[in-house]
């Protein structure tokens, strides 16, 4: 879980475009965030298994 200060800092606009980085909307994790869903891989997996992300199905081939 991210510190509240880091989450608040991330919500402010960055001074330069290269300073901006993505954080998970659910838990605040800064690494391995899927931009399309704004979720980290851990939260994405949990919500996908529960069926709470529309259009996401388990791969089978």
Curated annotation (Swiss-Prot):
Taxonomic superkingdom: Bacteria
| One of the GO biological process terms | translation
| Details of cofactor binding | Binds 1 zinc ion per subunit.
Q: Where are the bilayer-spanning segments?
A: none
SUPFAM superfamilies registered for this protein in UniProt = Glucocorticoid receptor-like (DNA-binding domain)
> What is one term from the GO cellular component aspect held by the record?
small ribosomal subunit
Q: Name one GO molecular function term.
A: zinc ion binding
* Keyword rRNA-binding found: yes
Positions with a binding annotation for Zn(2+)? 24, 27, 40, 43
Q: So which cofactors does this thing need?
A: Zn(2+)
Q: Which UniProt keywords apply?
A: Metal-binding, Ribonucleoprotein, Ribosomal protein, RNA-binding, rRNA-binding, Zinc
The record's note on quaternary structure and interaction partners says:
Part of the 30S ribosomal subunit. Contacts proteins S3 and S10.
Q: Which family does it belong to?
A: Belongs to the universal ribosomal protein uS14 family. Zinc-binding uS14 subfamily.
Q: What does the record give as the function of this protein?
A: Binds 16S rRNA, required for the assembly of 30S particles and may also be responsible for determining the conformation of the 16S rRNA at the A site.
> Under what name is this protein listed?
Small ribosomal subunit protein uS14
Q: Which organism is it from?
A: Streptococcus uberis (strain ATCC BAA-854 / 0140J)
């Amino acid at each position: 879980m991210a510190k509240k200060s880091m989450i608040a800092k991330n919500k402010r606009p960055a001074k330069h475009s290269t300073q901006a980085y993505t954080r998970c909307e659910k838990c605040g994790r800064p690494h391995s965030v899927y931009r399309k869903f704004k979720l980290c891989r851990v939260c994405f997996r949990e919500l996908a298994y529960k069926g709470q992300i529309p259009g996401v199905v388990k791969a089978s081939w």
